[in-house]
A protein has these predicted regions:
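Acidic/aromatic-lined carbohydrate-recognition and catalytic surfaces
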Residues: 1-95, 99, 111-171
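Structural preference for beta-strand elements that scaffold enzyme active sites
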Residues: 104-106, 160-164, 187
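Noncatalytic carbohydrate-binding groove/subsite architecture in carbohydrate-active enzymes
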Residues: 167-187
């Protein structure tokens, strides 16, 4: 089964509630930031990070009055894996699939569950739109492996299932061991 942990659809009930109710638990399931403003008072993204699709990694939501992170498409808002309640929900969903008899997962975009917690602009060169293609801001970060090991312990331990992670974002061969080492790896 293709398991997508990085994002939901912008039509998912969680995101719809998150947009409409900033005080809801669902709002904290996503990565929201206040805008910066230009001289004319127009909202600007909170960082200069580019998405994998070369536009901003942020989309402004008029209803919420904030930017949400989306490293792929504005139709795919990123989940906030720093939120322990979100992690518990995603782990429960994964367990449910296993309980229904699924014998494995291809984990889509798994390298991107953690973000640079400082949310500072990248210092890499920027493109004509002022955006930096700096995957180090949201790929293969140390917290990712904490999240995945937690999932391994709470969901996968004791189960006979196959997991294959789609890993990108400039993962090195050494980093591959963080994912796949039999004793200490995340899968």
């Amino acid at each position: 089964l293709d398991l997508i942990l990085n994002h939901t659809s912008d039509e998912h009930p969680w995101f719809i509630k998150a947009r409409a109710h900033p005080d809801s638990p669902e709002h904290a399931f996503y990565i929201w930031k206040e805008p910066r403003y230009d001289a004319a008072g127009c909202p600007l993204p909170p960082t200069n990070w580019a998405s994998f699709f070369a536009d901003s990694a942020w989309a402004y939501d008029e209803q919420a009055g904030q930017y949400y992170m989306k490293i792929f498409s504005r139709k795919m808002p990123d989940l906030n894996w720093a939120n322990p309640i979100l992690r518990q929900r995603m782990e429960a969903i994964t367990r449910q699939w296993l309980d229904m008899g699924i014998d494995g997962f291809r984990v889509d975009a798994v390298a991107h569950l953690a973000r640079d917690p400082e949310f500072q602009d990248s210092e890499l060169p920027v493109n004509a739109q002022g955006l930096a293609a700096d995957w180090s801001k949201f790929s293969n970060l140390p917290a990712l492996f904490d999240y995945l090991r937690e999932c391994k312990q709470t969901v996968l331990a004791g189960r006979d299932c196959l997991t294959i992670g789609e890993v990108g974002g400039g993962a090195s061969p050494q980093m591959a061991l963080n994912y796949a080492d039999k004793e200490t790896g995340a899968f």
